[in-house]
Amino acid sequence: MPKKLFIRTFGCQMNEYDSDKMADVLNASEGVIKTDNPEEADIILFNTCSVREKAQEKVFHDLGRVRHLKKLNPNLVIGVGGCVASQEGDAIIARAPYVDVVFGPQTLHRLPQLIAERKAKGKAAVDVSFPEIEKFDAMPPSEIKGASAFVSIMEGCSKFCTFCIVPYTRGGEVSRPFNDVLTEVADLAAHGVGEVTLLGQNVNAYRGDMEGTEEKADLALLIEYIAEVPGIERIRYTTSHPREMTQSLFDTYVKVPKLVSHLHLPVQAGSDRVLAAMKRGYTTLEYKSIIRKLRAARPDISLSSDFIVGFPGETDEDFEKTMKLIDDVGFDSSFSFIYSPRPGTPALELDDSTPADVKSARLLRLQKRIDEQAQAISQTMVGSIQRVLVEGTSKKDVHELAGRTDNNRIVNFSGNPRLINTFVDVRITSSLSHTLRGEIVIRED
């Protein structure tokens, strides 16, 4: 009987991708299969996120909840991977001595060896090093799960914003070779994938080596080549940094219709004083200039962003500037949070005296404004025909289908389940608070 693996994933899309790769590695080496039930698992892995303190503490809480399973099954392997593992290393074993393996984002491919080392030596195995591109070279082929797939094209971050722990937990920016990415995309397309999402902490900083030349490919060139892969109908990329938005990338929105009309471009704040304290490397005017260029290239582009509320020293005036930026840009959605101090980051040394209730009130105001804007944008889509990738059944009604539009909206509609993992045309009939409703359009050629 094959061994079973349970994985709990915290955090970003990169972590979701990494969790899939953990499963692929263990399946290829030992025939391990996934389970949704930790109580029947032979291996339990936590793929962690350290961007915010709450997510970090949740990991140790969840570790405590599976400790009893170790007593019931002494052969159970418990592992901690991801950014908390990279940050804490051996300290995880000190705090939770029943953990067997600790590995970082760049060493997940070594999982089989780490598990074998744990069993051979009788003590926890820890590897949180940064072996750059080795991880990708050691990966087995991906398991194809549908018509949409993530493709990691680079790792790490070299920006060192004062609030962010990612450069310390994932290392500096490292890009995969250009041809390696194209080969993976072509393989995915050959197995029925029609939509790819290119992943990286700063994905638009991609600079991949090209065979036969000393030149490096940027994200714009990579997208142009991916668009030529037979079977690929839609291309996304995330997450971007404003400092890496180039004219060649703006031009790609004109040249490549398969590149979606949606971009997640974190701004974090609308005050130049706060942006400087964060060391983001741009001003609000420069950010708005980027938005103007994007909309000149793709007028209907939908924009989402990240916001940190209550950064040390943020005044009421600073926050009002953020609200003005939200109005000026017309963001479609956001990931917005109250500032969470991270150990080892420069912002930890800044005065953080803003009362918690003030921070909470600011966050609620910001989220309400963006929700209002999102609903207004959704309303303008009513009556339009949207190309939708059918992802599965609706979360609220299993008798309906749910899919995603080019501009990243969820649409629920009636249809045959055989349409799952295909593209269909849907007329939007109504707009709800967070989703759209529609009906399939049969085109007459």
Curated annotation (Swiss-Prot):
One cellular component term from this protein's GO annotations in UniProt: cytosol
Subcellular location, principal: cytoplasm
Cofactor: [4Fe-4S] cluster
InterPro entries (UniProt xref): Elp3/MiaA/NifB-like_rSAM, Methylthiotransferase, Methylthiotransferase_CS, Methylthiotransferase_N, Methylthiotransferase_N_sf, MiaB_methiolase, rSAM, rSAM_horseshoe
Family matches, as SMART domains: Elp3
GO MF terms, alphabetically ordered: 4 iron, 4 sulfur cluster binding; metal ion binding; N6-isopentenyladenosine methylthiotransferase activity
Enzyme class, broadest EC rank: transferase
EC number of this enzyme: 2.8.4.3
Protein purpose: Catalyzes the methylthiolation of N6-(dimethylallyl)adenosine (i(6)A), leading to the formation of 2-methylthio-N6-(dimethylallyl)adenosine (ms(2)i(6)A) at position 37 in tRNAs that read codons beginning with uridine.
Family per record: Belongs to the methylthiotransferase family. MiaB subfamily.
Official protein name in the record: tRNA-2-methylthio-N(6)-dimethylallyladenosine synthase
